[in-house]
Amino acid sequence: MTNSNRIKLTWISFLSYALTGALVIVTGMVMGNIADYFHLPVSSMSNTFTFLNAGILISIFLNAWLMEIIPLKTQLRFGFILMVLAVAGLMFSHSLALFSAAMFVLGLVSGITMSIGTFLITQLYEGRQRGSRLLFTDSFFSMAGMIFPMVAAFLLARSIEWYWVYACIGLVYLAIFILTFGCEFPALGKHAQHSQAPVVKEKWGIGVLFLAVAALCYILGQLGFISWVPEYAKGLGMSLNDAGALVSDFWMSYMFGMWAFSFILRFFDLQRILTVLAGMAAVLMYLFITGTQAHMPWFILTLGFFSSAIYTSIITLGSQQTKVASPKLVNFILTCGTIGTMLTFVVTGPIVAHSGPQAALLTANGLYAVVFVMCFALGFVSRHRQHSSPAAH
């Protein structure tokens, strides 16, 4: 594989994460405007965004098999057509049913693209380099999560309709579409060149189960925590701006943490540093929940920084449980993480209604403790040390 081809594929991976990050994180910015557009209360409008999450979940789950049937380049190009149709549907339709369908299609497209992006990184890089590359790729999710809410705020402040925000997000996919030209993708399944040696199917092992549980608990814990921090802070008497600043601080330090750890991880055994980071994140979250208002910004900044490498390290370790990176295995762990996203309000909503926001934060803290236990237990069964090598292809 040529170096320019590898760079193109790597950029497709970066942009695939940016696309999903933009779609997921911009939701809160435009929800009120969309509710006004359809003359609905915001509470009932938020339910329609479940279609976006459902699309992401279904596509990541199915793409473990679709990758072996439909070439990756074909999937990405077809995804561009679907993206254009979905954005056009948002622009020209005043039907709530069509809006929900368009959101579902956007979810499908971003889920397929993100699973392809993850798989490309696991194919292009090996060993410790794979972990640092995946981490840098994941930082594009957070970067888009910082940039596109600002784009949305800029457009909405000038009374430009909300659907132009999604047109701007579509430009990310346009860049992916352009990059597919003159670019060779790894072939899978029936499209792959089969050698004379029979392919040995590898068993995943119990370590994959530990990592899948860790992925689900981590995402559910993280989103359950960050979704209710503003309400919790307001309950303590903080202003809306100060409560919002806590969330911004978290994502900002999360992004800087990803960049820092994409360099740091190369020098450590991945399972050991993951266990340390999971333990630190659980302790820092507990200190945030039980600490004074004066210390809350510092605790959430350090929590964002030290928890930034956890999810990507889980995926990287999963890909290293077999000698050859398996798209089904990587997608299985991604699916478990996405289930965590889907369950966020299903789990935390009733807890907040019954016991208040602090109970939701403590639940998230408990989930982080489960992540620590899973990562610690993984140390006894992980196969990554025998499968990882420091060199890239």
From Swiss-Prot:
It is a multi-pass membrane protein. GO terms for molecular function: transmembrane transporter activity. It is found in: Cell inner membrane. It holds the Pfam family MFS_1. Keywords: Cell inner membrane, Cell membrane, Membrane, Transmembrane, Transmembrane helix. HAMAP family: MFS_TsgA. Belongs to the major facilitator superfamily. TsgA family. This is Protein TsgA. It comes from Salmonella paratyphi B (strain ATCC BAA-1250 / SPB7).
